[in-house]
A protein has these predicted regions:
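Peripheral (often C-terminal) accessory segments that flank ATP-dependent C-N-forming ligase machineries
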Residues: 140-193
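Gly/Ser/Thr-rich active-site loops/lids in small-molecule metabolic enzymes
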Residues: 126-144
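Short, flexible/disordered intra-domain loops and linkers
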Residues: 15-18, 128-130, 169-175
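Active-site nucleotide/adenylate-binding loops and adjacent lid/helix of ATP-dependent enzymes
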Residues: 1-94
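Short helix-to-loop capping/linker segments positioned immediately adjacent to catalytic or ligand/cofactor-binding
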Residues: 37-38, 93-101, 145-150
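Conserved metal-phosphate-binding beta-hairpin within the catalytic cores
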Residues: 98-128, 150-169
Length: 193
């Protein structure tokens, strides 16, 4: 049944480039791409969730939402301080069935509260925004299967995505940065990628 969503099977960098809505069998034939799969078209919030799992048990969660920029890319991500209890319950049930002995970080991409991707890795764009000591705790989790990090003062943070040619030297307009900081003073930590 159409519409469906077509996307690359392998998506090593977590970018949705190349994905598209396919509205009919004719549309499918016109846009058939080698290396793509199709899935039910989901609607709702697109959430990226990192979870620290110790022997299959969730010990820590963090959720981020992206602002779409078109072409399967995002303009920026908001790393939320708040929890998403319903999504966490859904993901915890899935992990109990599929990852009951796993210790490490798992990243989920969901749309409308349904899993579209699951990765045995973290979102690599913003672990430094999770707080002091988080990276060391992740290393300990992989090394010994234990999660000991205690989060203090969780804050909303932002990661701005920069797409551009590799090898080009980019400059930042310090005045624009200061104006943006003044506009969003007190909203959280800002981070550029």
């Amino acid at each position: 049944r159409y519409p469906v969503f077509s996307k690359p099977i392998f998506n090593m960098r977590g970018m949705g480039t190349g994905g598209r809505i396919v509205r009919s069998a004719r549309d499918h034939r016109l846009h058939l791409e080698p290396g793509h799969m199709w899935m039910r078209l989901l609607t709702g919030a697109h959430v990226s969730t990192d979870v620290a799992l110790a022997k299959g048990r969730p010990k820590w969660w963090r959720h981020a939402t992206g602002k779409p920029a078109g072409g399967g890319t995002f303009d920026h991500w908001t790393i939320h301080a708040t929890r998403r209890p319903a999504l966490e319950r859904y993901l915890a049930r899935w992990m109990r069935r599929k990852l009951k002995h796993f210790s490490g970080i798992v990243n989920f991409e969901t749309i409308g509260g349904r899993i579209i991707e699951a990765h045995l890795r973290m979102a690599d764009q913003w672990p430094d925004l999770y707080g002091a000591g988080w990276t060391e705790a992740a290393v300990e989790l992989y090394r010994g299967g234990r999660w000991r990090w205690r989060e203090r003062g969780r804050r909303t943070a932002y990661s701005v995505v920069l797409f551009g040619d590799h090898g080009r030297r980019w400059s930042i307009d310090a005045g624009s940065v200061e104006r943006l900081r003044a506009m969003h003073a007190g909203e959280g930590d800002h981070h550029r990628r």
